[in-house]
Curated annotation (Swiss-Prot):
Role description: Probable transcription factor that promotes early floral meristem identity in synergy with APETALA1, FRUITFULL and LEAFY. Is required subsequently for the transition of an inflorescence meristem into a floral meristem. Seems to be partially redundant to the function of APETALA1.
Further information: This is a truncated version of CAULIFLOWER that may contribute to the 'cauliflower'-shaped floral meristem (curd). This trait has likely been selected by early farmers during the domestication of modified inflorescence structures.
Gene Ontology biological process: cell differentiation; flower development; positive regulation of transcription by RNA polymerase II
Localisation: Nucleus
Domain K-box as annotated: residue spans: 90-150
Keywords, ordered alphabetically: Activator, Coiled coil, Developmental protein, Differentiation, DNA-binding, Flowering, Nucleus, Transcription, Transcription regulation
Quaternary context: Homodimer capable of binding to CArG-box sequences.
Annotated protein name in UniProt: Truncated transcription factor CAULIFLOWER A
Main location: nucleus
Amino acid sequence: MGRGRVEMKRIENKINRQVTFSKRRAGLLKKAHEISILCDAEVSLIVFSHKGKLFEYSSESCMEKVLERYERYSYAEKQLKAPDSHVNAQTNWSMEYSRLKAKIELWERNQRHYLGEDLESISIKELQNLEQQLDTSLKHIRSRKNQLMH
């Protein structure tokens, strides 16, 4: 016998809400991974918990590349839909502000990762890339230190 349909409304019980979020988040990440494999689609998923914790998934390429591609696409779409070439300056500034704000958030997240913080939300592939970047940086630092010492 199958389960009944769940009524789409906020779960009032905090513990039940957290358990549901955790289970559904795992299912959502799994579905994102499945569609990327089955359909050879480039998939990125960003989820923030009610406490602001980030959970993300990105197929093959890194999240930054996908977000930059999305920004370029969104900007191009908005330019095509503009009625004339003199689009409202306020809209352009708002778009630029949003784009720069997203970039800053990305840099801040990367900085936290470089400092070893907030690593629970990234995949094994991203952890391997991070480790490789840190190894390369450490080699450069040691090389420079050795130059200065001799």
